[in-house]
Amino acid sequence: KKSTNHKSKFKIAGVEFGGDLIPIFAGPNMVESKDLILDVAKNIRQIGAHFLRGGAFKPLTFPYRSKKYNETREDGIKWLGIAKEKYDIPVITEVMEEKFLPMICEVADILQIGSRNMQNYPLITAAAKTKKPLMIKRHYGSSLRDWLGAAEYALVEGNEKILLCERGVSVPHTHRSTSRFLLDLQVVPAAQEMTHLPIVVDPSHATFWRPWIKSMSLASVACGADGIMLEVHPDPENSAVDPLQPIDFKSFKKLMKQLASIAPIVGRTI
């Protein structure tokens, strides 16, 4: 365990974390179809995203599925691989069960441990043993101490390429009846006082509300985030999952320009 005076720097698929660059993860919540993920990969790569995100395996709050929902699972992983190769963009996707690790590791550059599995220590341990970089999302009811403890389960396996991702906490008041979480930007500097690991912020899941994505993304840069994860979809209102939170390509392009303009103020780049 390194001193907190030290900040880890490492590269994943040629992209540096922990330095001046603030890498951007972008893509749909769910890999809905081959055509959709190829369209997204093409556009976000052209706009400047560093990683393609998309879930082939999706944990939902309720087991009920809308007519639009189709968990693509093995096919989704295959389509992510096709998009990765065609548009030369690295991939992050969630792993929910240990048995799917070999298949997912063939495609993913980063394994995402979702918030609901933040304290699934056997899963974290198994994922860490693959030596693939991990992103561990903070559970919406967990303390900073719990979150860092989850990361330690990966670190003790000798896997030092660990990203931590803040994606909102559950509080009594979230400013909108449709919002479930509050983005805890205070945790970014707080975590940086206690850990050497890079801190990524996910404003999309935290706000659950498209109009707030811009301001919370800009604020994430201002507070010292080491990466930003954004939900981007070609037709947000018809997204199969969480249609209130994705932004479209035009909005993403505009936001990327705004992020690039303010990053130098805090000594960073996009």
Specify the residue positions occupied by each region the protein language model found.
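Catalytic domains of carbohydrate-active enzymes, especially glycoside hydrolases
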Residues: D39-A56
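Catalytic beta/alpha-barrel core
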Residues: R53, N70-T72, D88-F100, D109-P122, ...
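C-terminal alpha-helical cap/extension of soluble enzyme domains
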Residues: F208-W209, I213-I270
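Active-site mouth loops of central-metabolism enzymes
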Residues: L21-D39, F62-N70, P90-E94, G114-S115, ...
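N-terminal amphipathic alpha-helix/helix-capping segment at the start of soluble metabolic enzymes
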Residues: K1-F25, V266-I270
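Glycine-rich, proline-tolerant flexible connector loops at the mouths of alpha/beta enzymes
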Residues: R53-D75, P234-L244
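Catalytic alpha/beta core domains of metabolic enzymes, predominantly
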Residues: I12, F17, T130-V232
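Alpha-helix-loop-beta-strand connector modules within alpha/beta enzyme cores
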Residues: S66-T93, A127-P133, L185-I199, Q245-R268
